[in-house]
Design a protein with these regions (language model features):
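Non-catalytic carbohydrate-binding regions of carbohydrate-active enzymes
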Residues: 2-37, 50, 114, 263-278, ...
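Solvent-exposed loop and edge beta-strand segments that line ligand/cofactor-binding
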Residues: 4, 50-69, 90, 95, ...
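Active-site lining segments of carbohydrate-active enzymes
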Residues: 115-201, 211-212, 216-220
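Low-complexity, Ser/Thr/Pro/Gly-enriched N-terminal "stalk/linker" regions
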Residues: 1-67, 100, 104, 108-157
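Extended, well-ordered alpha-helical scaffold segments
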Residues: 4-15, 85-108, 127, 169, ...
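Extended ligand-binding clefts on enzyme/binding-domain cores
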Residues: 106-162, 229-232, 236, 254-364
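Aromatic-lined, polymer-binding surfaces characteristic
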Residues: 168-174, 181-185, 195-250, 254-257, ...
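Well-ordered alpha-helical scaffold segments within catalytic/enzyme domains
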Residues: 70-91, 176-192, 234-251, 300-314, ...
Length: 447
């Protein structure tokens, strides 16, 4: 039987090729006849899935989500050290793709919903009568300029505003984009116009993060409005790393970013629920309790934030306790977790009672659990964490077909793939997890 390490190497190569299909997908044209749209992607767009579905039954993910695209760019950065990355025989340089992404995002700053409203007499006539109910009202579009664009969740792959109703605002996008840019700037030789554009985007994203973190928004699952652990944690990290970058450029701005970051982390300390043994994922704007308090979003936040500190990082015992609680939840809830081989860990979802498509399991959730173990694998508990991480990966291996293709979910009862096909986030999560495993093995002195 193929060893786990050999399978990881083979699957990562496939994940890289498939993820690249979502970056600058210029060869795909997306038709949305109900909205009268024909979308020709622009260079630098990163679609959540390159499959042009239309809820038939798979969801339409042919949009550039700010969050998903930043996560994909972080995975691309991890591949960058290998130089050209294979896209089915045609080398595509990671740095060139990052440059396209930066250019695409810079252009978004000029979007203005007021211009869309002024032209609405023309484009609204192309919308089918039964799709009018899904359109954003003119009053909402009128407010869509400046910072509102940065919180607008997603845009079309051609760089135009999304005219359909959706869960807005979402304030994690600028923070995640800032983290992606900061990390590329530290690890790659950016020069000339690309560096200038990166710095301009970065300043805007840090300002947005500093000014908006106290405001309620929708969560990363786009379902509930409130103050969310994920959004707050990635915002705190963006401001902390941004302060380091600003320190020699604008000392006062650096101090401001660092103070806001520390204020956010102090707020997140209050999300710990000692009687339940986990970090809550949200405080709802309504003040009502949420059934989604225990959520993989907390683990995902720790991974995106990185390893710079202990609190609210993969090495935080409370983050690890939150993963333990999630294990117990999905052990009880998912049929595919019952009677599994001892070499496999539990398949994980998002939260209890998820009703989206099959309601999980999710590849990115189970991979996040593995990555958390690898990132936390230091000190006396290292070997146990490495072994635990491998058990999650064995579960992922069991539910990925021989083709290596990854959807968004695998059914909690049957293990069959469901929801969006070729989800870029699934592939990015695999790449990030594999990199964390290699780093952890290096710390151990193994291979």
């Amino acid at each position: 039987m193929e060893t786990l390490s050999a399978w990881i190497d083979r699957q990562q190569a496939h994940a890289a090729r498939q993820m690249l299909r979502s970056i600058s997908p210029l060869g795909i044209v997306k038709a949305r006849p109900g909205f009268g749209q024909l979308i020709h992607p622009a260079p630098g767009a990163v679609v959540a899935s390159p499959v042009p579905a239309s809820y038939d039954p798979d969801p339409d993910y042919f949009f550039h989500w700010y969050r998903d695209s930043a996560i994909v760019m972080e995975a691309l950065r991890l591949l960058h050290t290998a130089g050209p990355v294979d896209a089915g025989g045609e080398p595509r340089h990671a740095l060139a793709l990052f440059g396209e992404y930066v250019g695409f995002n810079a252009a978004l700053r000029g979007l203005d919903g007021r211009r869309l409203v002024a032209a609405s007499g023309e484009w609204r006539t192309r919308v089918a009568p039964d799709f009018v109910q899904y359109l954003r009202p003119d009053a909402e579009l009128e407010r869509l300029h400046g910072d509102a664009v940065a919180a607008d969740t997603r845009v079309n792959a051609d760089g135009s505003l999304d005219i359909s109703n959706w869960a807005r605002p979402q304030n994690d996008g600028p923070a995640l984009r800032a983290l992606s840019i900061l990390r590329w700037m530290r690890g790659a030789a950016l020069a000339g116009e690309l560096r200038t554009t990166c710095e301009a985007l970065l300043r805007e994203d840090l300002r947005f993060a500093s000014e908006h973190w106290r405001l309620p928004c929708y969560d990363l699952w786009e379902e509930e409005r409130g103050l969310h652990y994920f959004t707050l944690r990635v915002t705190a990290q963006a401001l902390e790393e941004g302060a380091d970058w600003l320190a020699e450029r604008a000392a006062a701005a650096a101090r401001g970013c660092r103070a806001e970051s520390q204020a956010i982390l102090a707020t997140l300390d209050g999300y710990w629920l000692p009687d339940r043994g986990y970090y809550r994922s949200r405080l709802l704007e309504s003040g009502e309790p949420s059934a989604k308090e225990l959520d993989i979003a907390v683990v995902l936040a720790a991974l995106q934030a990185g390893d710079g500190s202990v609190a609210h990082s993969p090495r935080d015992p409370r983050i690890q306790a939150t993963l333990d609680a999630l294990d117990a939840l999905f052990e009880a809830d998912y049929l595919i977790n019952r009677g599994r081989p001892a070499a496999r860990g539990p398949a994980l979802g998002r939260y209890r009672g998820d009703r989206y498509y099959s309601g999980g399991a999710y590849y990115f959730s189970t991979l996040a659990a593995a990555e958390l173990c690898f990132r936390a694998a230091t000190g006396s508990g290292r070997d146990a964490l490495l072994a635990r991480g491998d058990r999650y990966l064995e579960t992922v291996r069991a539910f990925i077909p021989e083709s290596g293709d990854m959807s968004e979910q695998f059914d909690q009862r049957t293990g069959e793939q469901t929801s969006a096909k070729h989800l870029a986030w699934s592939y990015a999560a695999f790449i990030s997890c594999a990199a964390a495993r290699r780093a952890a093995s290096g710390r151990q002195g193994g291979s």
